[in-house]
């Protein structure tokens, strides 16, 4: 296939985290710069790209299921171009080609900005695997963003941590921070385009700047997430700032104080704790104790008493005892999270914990996950009660898909909120809403 016969329609299916979603937006922008048009239906597309996740085994198996269907279609439509990007592509590399030889391109997440160059090789008749570690270059194309109100901006790629259960450093590479100038320029453009909220993204976002040159007179890194928040805070048009995901090792009081002082920074913090037991945390190689984690949350609430806290937790880690699991339950009960993403431990290839001989049964993991989720829902419902009859600022993002007489958006604390209104008139507006009904993870109210 040559560039002149490039397929005109494309479809991207994205699995996994916000980083993957942001990568997909950038790759969509590249494809549209190349002349491709979006297709809602993958079965009518000439190029299909799966941006994959390898955090858990079920996500990986789902990818192979999708690929199997499209591989059959390619036998009937040989001009179909099949691309696998993201973390499964990085982890499996050429192994995917042996399993699905119909693939045209396998590319790791570090190569997202090189999509056009890689497709040029494909259209010249090559089957391409791009998984070698590289320095991530700035993307000069405009992402095809899924929203016209909120936007993600990557500020740091990769991860230098070596958690014993996690495959991310293997598939996303070492930390690479973007320059403050590049981040500012992207956000300035977003403000001019009418975006109201920006979420800064990174695997360990509070580690931002450690790899950039320069130190201060006091010996700290010259570029940090705290400094960046001050730098981008006053960009015209941007009304709200968020950031994710934070690592407890790098979440400082200086950062907390900045979030308190800067009015555009929303009072919502996503800080995974993974386990409430110190021995499990040590086995996970997380680099902190549950006491350290509790201290961070206490400090946040000292500066911002009403702040919303969300996190991630893993149950059924190899060797986790019932008593250790109960320490996780105790931490969740004590802190009271607004939202908690929970998962049963899933062994990932290439990670130390995957080959340990003290794996727990699926029955134990399932039981613990169910018990944790029950507590999470209870605590979230209790946390929601504080919103009842309060007036909250809601950024309207879209129409309620279940009720077209309502719009939906999020509070500064990241609570999904519904109220009656016309999306055409209200989209992108900050509206004061009196909360009349509360649920564990969402609110309903009336515009005032």
From Swiss-Prot:
Compartments in which it is found: Cytoplasm
Keyword tags: 4Fe-4S, Cytoplasm, Iron, Iron-sulfur, Metal-binding, S-adenosyl-L-methionine, Transferase, tRNA processing
CDD domains for the chain: Radical_SAM (cd01335)
Any one GO cellular component localisation term in the record: cytoplasm
Classification via InterPro entries: Elp3/MiaA/NifB-like_rSAM, Methylthiotransferase, Methylthiotransferase_CS, Methylthiotransferase_N, Methylthiotransferase_N_sf, MiaB_methiolase, rSAM, rSAM_horseshoe
Superkingdom as given in the UniProt entry: Bacteria
Positions contributing to [4Fe-4S] cluster 1 binding: 17, 53, 87
Domain TRAM per the UniProt entry, residue ranges: 385-448
Radical SAM core domain boundaries: 145-383
Bound cofactor: record note: Binds 2 [4Fe-4S] clusters. One cluster is coordinated with 3 cysteines and an exchangeable S-adenosyl-L-methionine.
EC number: 2.8.4.3
Physiological role: Catalyzes the methylthiolation of N6-(dimethylallyl)adenosine (i(6)A), leading to the formation of 2-methylthio-N6-(dimethylallyl)adenosine (ms(2)i(6)A) at position 37 in tRNAs that read codons beginning with uridine.
Matches recorded under HAMAP family: tRNA_metthiotr_MiaB (MF_01864)
Family recorded in the similarity comment: Belongs to the methylthiotransferase family. MiaB subfamily.
Subunit-level organization: Monomer.
Protein name: tRNA-2-methylthio-N(6)-dimethylallyladenosine synthase
